[in-house]
Amino acid sequence: MKRFFTLIAGATAAASMAALLGMSAAHAAEPAKASKPDLAAGEAKATQVCAACHAADGSRGLSANPILQGQHPQYLAKQLHEFKSAARKNAVMQGMAAPLTEDDIRNVSAFYASKQAKEGFARNKDTVALGEKIYRGGIAAKAVPACAACHSPNGAGLPAQYPRLSGQHAEYTKAQLVAFRQGDRTNNAQMATIAANLSDKEINALADYIAGLR
């Protein structure tokens, strides 16, 4: 009888140990949760690394550089990772992104995303109609889809998938579409395919129209 209870106790202990080990393995298999972005740290790093080109709050600096304020943090983080890995080519940005840690990227992206995007405006009234037509309806004859389908009718984009476009510098948008078309920017195959079918006139009209979206 004593031996029976000893066996039961041993089996119970073994089962408990197995359960404990199973729980430990399950916890070990769980991915570590990303820490919450630190906006103050993001602001400090942005001031140190980014502000000279993108302004302290990511607002309307030089038109050759993108406006960052109000951009989706997932998109900003993705671009920084791709600059860092050289998946997106830009000598200046690759140098800036290279020393950034994962926390730096998360914090800086969240900081710029937390800023309220300012409204922009279209400058060329003669091309607004063409830009609007392409943005909202695409160009069926060229298999160019409507930009609004992915970037939303008001250019707000879709977090984690498509960037915000509204209010972006026309010069920057134009430069990126041309880079996609020429194969100089290769980190988005879908955009490369679309841009390949756009003429200079269509790109200019589209970029100017996007600058005034709100």
Model-based region annotation:
Residues E119, D126-Q161, S166:
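Surface-exposed interaction/gating patches
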Residues A46, F83, F111-Y112, F180, ...:
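Conserved hydrophobic/aromatic "anchor" residues
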